[in-house]
């Protein structure tokens, strides 16, 4: 018998023990996602975010997943590594390079929508753009930092839509992987969104396995299933520098 089924983002949310209204998960691979749970039926009338049944939805207990997707996330960071960063630089080197530049990248702005149509923009395909460059002032480090900041700002634009639907995004659960390995990315996301970020040692494949185990009765309840979930790190918003982040 089939004990569980779910897509990649519900699996990721499940792996992070995200089941109840107000709980939020995120991932930041090739594309980036913020996924939250609603306890009532709601939707964005422009379909900029998707609403569908979460893994624990029943007729008696409404549990809907709301999914924000930003296509130009890790793919932009990878493009920046190939085309902008110094030859041989890895992602950790890029983070060190970007750290040499102040918040806001001295006015350089990267709009990260270069991976096809974006649902959050009502399926418009506007492309990626880089602006604000001064040939006498800016270099590779500015573009590397601005790319990560642009991704964060696009996340926050979509999160505002989710908040308009009644979601309280005060805490984000994520696996410590992909762009969440970047201190710059996660610190900027926490400080711009105002949300605490909790990083865990898990991924979507673990979620699929846990879901199957819960469905098959191997675990007596969710508490038992996630008793071994390991929290690795907590990132708080930088309230001291919040004005700098918001001005950027």
Task: Report each predicted region and the residues it spans.
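Conserved active-site beta-strand element of glycosyltransferases/polysaccharide synthases
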Residues: 25-26, 35
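Conserved phosphate-binding catalytic cores of ATP/NTP-utilizing and phosphoryl-transfer enzymes
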Residues: 6-23
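Glycine/Thr-rich phosphate-binding loops that ligate phosphate moieties of nucleotide
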Residues: 36-248
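Short beta-strand scaffold segments in enzyme catalytic cores
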Residues: 11-14, 32-36, 110
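Short pre-catalytic strand/loop immediately N-terminal to key active-site residues, enriched for Gly-Thr
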Residues: 2-3, 199
């Amino acid at each position: 018998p089939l004990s569980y089924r779910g897509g990649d983002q519900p699996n990721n949310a499940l792996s992070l023990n995200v089941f109840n209204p107000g709980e939020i998960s995120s991932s930041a691979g090739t594309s980036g996602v913020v996924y939250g749970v609603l306890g009532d039926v709601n939707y964005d009338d422009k379909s900029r975010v998707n609403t569908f049944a979460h893994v624990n939805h029943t007729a008696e207990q409404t549990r809907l997943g709301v999914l924000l997707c930003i296509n130009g996330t890790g793919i932009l960071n990878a493009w920046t590594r190939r085309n902008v960063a110094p030859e041989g630089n890895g992602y950790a080197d890029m983070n060190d390079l970007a750290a040499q530049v102040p918040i806001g990248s001295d006015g350089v702005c990267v709009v990260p929508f270069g991976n096809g149509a974006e649902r959050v923009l009502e399926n418009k395909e506007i492309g990626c753009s880089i602006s604000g460059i001064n040939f006498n002032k800016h270099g590779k480090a500015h573009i590397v930092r601005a790319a990560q900041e642009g991704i964060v700002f696009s996340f926050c634009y979509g999160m505002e839509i989710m908040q308009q639907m009644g979601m309280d995004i005060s805490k984000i659960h994520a696996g410590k992987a992909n762009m969440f390995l970047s201190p710059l990315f996660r610190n900027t996301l926490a400080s711009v969104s105002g949300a605490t970020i909790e990083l865990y040692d898990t991924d979507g494949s673990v979620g699929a396995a846990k879901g199957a185990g819960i469905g098959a009765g191997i675990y007596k309840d969710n508490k038992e299933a996630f008793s071994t979930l390991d929290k690795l790190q907590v990132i708080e918003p930088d309230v001291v520098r919040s004005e700098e982040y918001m001005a950027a």
